[in-house]
Amino acid sequence: MSPSLAIIGFYFGRWPAWIEFFVETCKWNPDIHWFIYTDCGSPENRADNVLIRHISFADYKALARRRTGITADPDNPYKLCDLRPAQGHIHADDIAGYDFFGFGDLDVFYGRIRGIFTDALFNAHDVLSTHPEIVSGHFAVLRNTEELRRAYELMPAFDHWMHKPDYFRVDDREFAHLFEPAGALAHLRTRFVEEYSTILSPRGWHDGTMNYPLRWLWKNGRLTNSADGAREFLYLHVMRWKSLRHAAATPAATEGAWTRLDRIVKFDWRRAGRDGFCISPDGITAAATAGLRDGDF
């Protein structure tokens, strides 16, 4: 039997336009479960493995304070990303019985997770990150142990960081220090390997260039793109298309592309399971548009 995995997510305010497509990509990973804490109601697209936990932003913060002892009361839901090193402890009841837990953003479209994160990979590691130098806050996996659920307690400044009004990268940069050679969790078996799934990242593409594929096809659970033929990818992280929050001084041509669209979603999600769909700077469109050349932008 494959190691079991539960992924923790949260979203407060209003669902992103692509939520139904996010759920569809989760649905095609049926033996992985997502727990999403939200005040947004239930998406139209229902999946047995996507478990919506209805909770207000205020009540979620109160839960975090009660479980961790922190005293911070952030105003912005985005600040909750800094809580991720504590989420295993905060949600210990929901993830009880799973071999692994993880955390994940909702600006991610998944391919076949177990096609890349194999049983052998799970069995040989305690922590799986998809970036080489940080814990990938948008999707990372940890063995479900007391030590890792309470890893935030090994960060003396955790409560101090949570009091900073802006996101402080506790979940990726600061968390990663625990797994460095001199870190408190250096004894654990970690895999920090770039999976090339965050487009427009300054790390560059796997061919050593900054020429990122711009058209991605999701179909029947498989995620491919316009540059790499049949090669499948773990997920696509559209952080740099959906906003300019992380843009460099001179952004790439398609950075923040979705902020300039009248509509991000231009395809009926009810057809996604049957027909697939394309993800690109043009938004979410019919699968047939994935065959166009990147130069068409």
Where do the PLM segments sit?
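Short, acidic, metal-binding catalytic loop of nucleotide-sugar glycosyltransferases
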Residues: 23-33
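Active-site-proximal specificity loops/subdomain of glycosyltransferases
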Residues: 39-94
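Short glycine- and hydrophobic/aromatic-rich loop-to-beta-strand nucleating segment
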Residues: 138-146
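N-proximal low-complexity "stem/linker" segments adjacent to membrane-targeting elements
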Residues: 1-20
